[in-house]
Amino acid sequence: MAESNKMKDMPVNKLMIQMGIPMILSMALQAVYNIVDSAFVGNMRVGSEAALNALTLVFPVQMLMVAAGIGTGVGTNALLARTLGQGNREKAAKVAGNSLFLGVIIYVVCLLFGIFGVKAYISSQTVDSEVLEMGVSYLRICCVISFGIIFFSLFEKLLQATGRSLYSTIGQVVGTVVNIILDPIMIYGIGPCPEMGVKGAAYATVIGQVASAVLLLIFHMKLNREFGHGPKYMKPNAGVIKEIYAIGLPAIIAQALMSIMVYVMNLILKFNPSAQTAYGLFYKVQQFVLFLAFGLRDAITPIIAFAYGMRSKKRIQDGIKYGLIYTIALMILGIAITEIFPGAFATLFNSGQSREYFIGAMRVISVSFLFAGINVAYQGIYQALDGGLESLVISLLRQLIIILPLAGIFSLFVRNGQMGVSLIWWAFPITEIISCFVGYVFLKKIRKNRVDVLN
């Protein structure tokens, strides 16, 4: 079945599984980058505790770079799928080309931050000179060679928009395998490679990302033949860029808010470096679980957007129904794994003094996965139906408006010795439950105003 016919005619429940599985695997493998680095770094012979703390502090900026690439890609994905659904091949070529132009701009910004801003950023979160040195070294490498992750994110969405998510997964697998192979070689110094510690972890990560980006570039040029390619389509078009970011900006802000949340949580937990490290390690496990929801969201968005472009009320309704059902099933599985095996994850990271805090965080925060996953699915539905504002509001509630004041207030009781650190972790389930209720109200409004009115 041709890709465009598949998006139009295949039953939505089957289409979502066919598109969703590769995307879920791709997102899970993306989370593996961070977990693998931390696992190998946690088992360094010298300085592993400081190194884990350093990786916790650099993580928000890594997330921010991914946010810029993925957010631009999300806007491109939905707009490209809708444009192809309308049969406008010329505009589709401009959408794809302008997304690559935006990728160049994003890389230049990351490069400049890597050269001039890294030290000030790390020093704002720690006074430990060893942690500062490791954090600066790691983050500078990731920023200067960030073109790999940025363009991988863009090519991934371009392939997903045309129903070729399997190929984006192949690229992700190749990059992950490269990273896993290089990590022990470059961190510990195996064979002719010198021991580089956290620098080795950074180099292994960016080399894997570049490998993925190059492979997806080849797939994009060879397989995405529904629209034209070439430098002429990269010429900036203000109208196209505006449309991309009308959809994608909320996704960028949502991802950026995750970075801000982790950064502020690091500041809140600064009084207890072990709890700070534990939170950073848990967040990587949490990302692994929630990236399952993100991967399914990336199937939900183009399926519903394509149906919206062709004004198919039935396929939109099916996309919403099955998207939520499959998301709930994945999140229940994630909760079961993290609640049953917290000790195994702690052992993987060799978390030392942070072990007790890590297990405590996992026991409490994993309860929120069900509601967090539903919120992610809601946002994918909103984005497909031009609900950028609603998506942004949910992100603000989840990552800023509720979570940070609540965690800050709870931390006062912890610092005064009235309660344990676990009180801070309860801010997460409370936030997700409130946001989920608001998200349901938004979904009812969008269905009434944009779906029920279709013929």
Where in the sequence are the language-model features?
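Helix-terminus/linker motif at the lipid-water interface of multi-pass membrane proteins
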Residues: 28, 32-53, 122-129, 185-196, ...
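Small-residue hotspots at the loop-to-helix junctions and early N-terminal turns
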Residues: 49-60, 135, 139, 273-288, ...
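Transmembrane helical elements of multi-pass membrane transporters/channels
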Residues: 18-37, 141, 175, 208-212, ...
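Transmembrane alpha-helix boundary and packing residues in multipass membrane permease domains
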Residues: 23, 27, 39, 78, ...
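N-terminal transmembrane alpha-helices
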Residues: 7-39, 43-47, 60-75, 79, ...
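Small-residue-rich hydrophobic transmembrane alpha-helices
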Residues: 52-112, 149-168, 278-342, 372-386, ...
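Short runs within selected transmembrane alpha-helices of multi-pass transporters and secretion channels
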Residues: 73, 142-160, 168-176, 201-216, ...
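Short alpha-helical transmembrane segments in multi-pass integral membrane proteins
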Residues: 1-20, 80-147, 193-249, 304-368, ...
